[in-house]
Amino acid sequence: GEQSPALKHVVCDDPRGLRHYTDAMLLSYDRLEEIGRDYAAQHPDFFARAVAAVQPHDAAAMFYTSGTTGKPKGVVLTHHALIDRARAVSEMENLTDREDVLAYLPPAWIGQNMFSYTQLLVTGFTVNHPESPDTVSIDMRDIGPTYYFAPPRVLEGLLTHVMIRMEDAGYLKRKLFHACMKLARRVGTRILDGESVNAWDRLRYALGNVLIYGPLRNALGMSRVRVAYTAGEAIGPDLFVFYRSIGINLKQLYGSTETSVFVCVQPDGQVRDDTVGPPVAGVEIRVGDNGESLVKRPGLVKEY
């Protein structure tokens, strides 16, 4: 329209509700693929040449900010910015092509692209997609991701669902659950971090792992999680400690769309509920006179 004169086409991946739209600029995703196949047949070298022509500091994608502190902005990030951050954290966490990831968050969000797609280019791990938004929890249990990201609201929703089921359980099962969780809150995070715990508590925790913690991780779909992150908003300390106490290596990170997500990440052995960890390799942070956090590293936002 008049506000976007350079816009030539709008591609829609779900045609439902668009039956009566006849504007020539509206394309279905299937039609776009068909056009691409036809063009590739007529110009067999085009796509290979286009890829070869890309430079590290060319624009790779545009992601929109949330708009919580102002109008949403379109953040342009380069190939170098995305790959650099993906590689830094993949190396830090020893991510390999053996990881399984569940891509269930909105694809327009920078976090989804980084955790599920950009790090895929660096590591070659397997990205799994849920069958539908309604089957995410079921698919998560079936897939058993080893590398996982969830905002606090998702973690809270998963826990609420489990706790509701537990309240419907029998008296003895509820009694056992609460006794095991009391122990987990006291020693679980210390065991996860490899700290010293007396033999009696270790033995009791191992028994609790068989009876409660293991089945609970399985019910959450996290029985195979090796590394899990949360970010996007502050997570309550009780919620954070709960997941870590049952043996899930949940960690916090800090970043933004403009920084390609990763600014600070909690390394193993330095996980606390009141910090977001030290700067990732290649990042410098300084607090300005006005209290703002100033971030410096190669490949920040290219432009708005």
Q: PLM features: what roles do these ranges have?
A:
Residues 59, 65-68, 101, 106, ...:
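Conserved S/T- and glycine-rich ATP-binding loop of Class I adenylate-forming
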Residues 12, 27, 34-64, 71, ...:
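Conserved pre-ATP/AMP-binding loop-to-beta segment of ANL
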Residues 48-51, 137, 217:
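Short hydrophobic/charged patches on amphipathic alpha-helices used for structural packing
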Residues 5, 142-143, 223:
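Active-site charged/polar residues at nucleotide-handling catalytic sites that mediate phosphoryl
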Residues 204, 208-304:
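Conserved AMP-binding/adenylate-forming
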Residues 60-86:
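Conserved AMP-binding A3 loop
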Residues 83-100, 107-213:
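Conserved AMP-binding/adenylation subdomain of ANL enzymes
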Residues 1-35, 49:
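Structural core segment of the AMP-binding/adenylate-forming
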